Amino acid sequence: MHLSLLKAKIHRATVTHSELNYEGSIAIDGLLLEATGIREFEQVHIWDVTNGARFSTYAIRAEEGSGIISLNGGAARHVQVGDLIIVAAFAGMSEDEAKTFKPNLVYVDAHNAISHTNHSIPTQAA
């Protein structure tokens, strides 16, 4: 069996730019790409916490340490500057690989600087 598991996520990043006339993508601060292991041109899912929009695009690198999270092209129509988003990437793997796999979870502050990282999500309580 082939499974698709969460590979990485950037949790509650703040959209800094929305560029409708730029070639489609999401530009992400290079430090965040490195911390998550998301590769340039990799497909990512965007979940807008502010307005509920959900869509996919591909990642491109923004300047390291810039805090840039820029939705470009058609994706810019789904967000506004200041929206909080989750950026997620998934990876395919076998059931055996999935048994030991741990995702790279990156949590950011209001300026999109890394506040902490983890490899698991706490159990949700009632």
Swiss-Prot record:
Major location (coarse): cytoplasm
Key word Cytoplasm present: yes
Metabolic or biological pathway: Cofactor biosynthesis; (R)-pantothenate biosynthesis; beta-alanine from L-aspartate: step 1/1
A GO term from the CC aspect: cytosol
Pfam families: Asp_decarbox
Matching InterPro entries: Asp_de-COase-like_dom_sf, Asp_decarbox
Bound cofactor: record note: Binds 1 pyruvoyl group covalently per subunit.
Record has NADP as a keyword: no
Cofactor(s) recorded in Swiss-Prot or TrEMBL: pyruvate
Catalytic site: 25 (schiff-base intermediate with substrate), 58 (proton donor)
Subcellular compartments: Cytoplasm
NCBIfam families, per database record: panD
Task of the protein: Catalyzes the pyruvoyl-dependent decarboxylation of aspartate to produce beta-alanine.
PANTHER family registered for this protein in UniProt: ASPARTATE 1-DECARBOXYLASE
Protein name: Aspartate 1-decarboxylase
Gene this protein is translated from: panD
